[in-house]
């Protein structure tokens, strides 16, 4: 994704999540009383999510038109299918910033596909073809591993998918792994013009031609860079403009679960990310849960962002836990 005046914040302490319950009120017409009915939310397994992140990284950089990209795409589709999802492979030839044809593949897993009430969960699975933010200029044309920027959001959602198979929520859930989010114009080729259209190619394509004709969802949650050590998440600007009630819902859940040190009660800047096409083209209110840091000098997304250091060393199970348990809480409390 491309930074748009992104605000930065100091990392706070780490909190662990576990099995949680939320209460919904049920009124008895006969007695005129209100009782509490507990909603059982599954426990997110951070070890499982960590493994899913590592298995993606083990393929190497998942860049467009590469063997690793093909193999990892097959792995992700097979994983979703093994968890009981109806899987769609949406393939398309898309045009990169330099005019080259990129073989894109959006991977969609639909849980309870016949349900009318649906929630969309998404992340991008491709990795940046260029480490163009690396402090060593010699690395700028090398692809990154994308453990955090790519694999972390997908890893969290694969664990969510595993839980959906074991305990079905009251609604339908669609998990989308968008391709070609991170093939936007590299810094060494940037011009003074607006190049925002060169990013988020997979989500742009899906938003114009969804996997199901007339597709709709109540709301969407995008996960991007959600596995780094000491990660903090601010209320991203476009999310607040286009889906403020969803932001409120997610941040409230995180605070209730004890993850307020990750989900900071403060507005952040604006980020050009996959939630943009979901909001603006598909017209589904979608928010972006994305890392922001005050202490890192190279980028508010972390010193390892778009560098060769974005590897498994930066991934923290506690961060995966905070994000994953929060997402599960939101999904299972939807009626």
Predicted ranges, named:
Residues 27-72, 83, 297-314:
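N-terminal capping segment at the start of a domain
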């Amino acid at each position: 994704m491309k930074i748009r005046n992104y605000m930065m914040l100091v990392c706070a302490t780490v909190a662990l999540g576990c099995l949680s319950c939320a209460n919904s009120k049920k009124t008895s017409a006969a007695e005129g009383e209100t009782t509490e009915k507990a909603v059982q939310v599954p426990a997110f397994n951070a070890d499982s999510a960590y493994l899913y992140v590592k298995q993606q990284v083990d393929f190497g950089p998942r860049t467009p038109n590469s063997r690793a990209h093909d193999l990892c795409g097959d792995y992700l589709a097979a994983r979703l299918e093994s968890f009981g999802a109806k899987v769609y492979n949406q393939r398309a030839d898309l045009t990169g910033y330099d005019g080259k044809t990129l073989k894109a593949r959006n991977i969609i897993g639909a849980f309870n596909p016949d349900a009318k009430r649906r929630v969309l969960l998404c992340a991008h699975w491709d990795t940046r073809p260029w480490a163009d933010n690396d402090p060593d200029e010699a690395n700028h044309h090398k692809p990154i591993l994308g453990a955090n920027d790519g694999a972390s959001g997908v890893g969290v959602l694969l664990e969510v998918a595993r839980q959906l198979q074991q305990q079905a929520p009251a609604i339908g859930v669609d998990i989308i792994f968008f391709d070609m989010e991170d093939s936007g114009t590299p810094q060494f080729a940037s011009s003074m013009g607006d190049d925002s259209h060169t990013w988020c190619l997979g989500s742009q394509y899906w938003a114009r031609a969804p996997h199901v004709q007339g597709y709709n969802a109540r709301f969407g949650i995008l996960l991007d860079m959600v596995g780094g050590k000491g990660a903090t998440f601010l209320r991203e600007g476009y999310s607040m403009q286009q889906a403020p009630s969803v932001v409120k819902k997610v941040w409230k859940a995180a605070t209730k679960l004890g993850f307020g040190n990750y989900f900071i009660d403060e507005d952040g800047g604006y980020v050009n990310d996959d939630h943009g096409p979901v909001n603006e083209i598909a017209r589904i209110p979608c928010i972006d849960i994305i890392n922001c840091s005050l202490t890192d000098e190279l980028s508010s997304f972390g010193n390892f962002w778009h560098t060769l250091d974005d590897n498994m060393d930066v991934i923290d199970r506690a961060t995966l836990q905070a994000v994953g348990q929060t997402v599960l809480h939101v999904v299972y409390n939807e009626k």
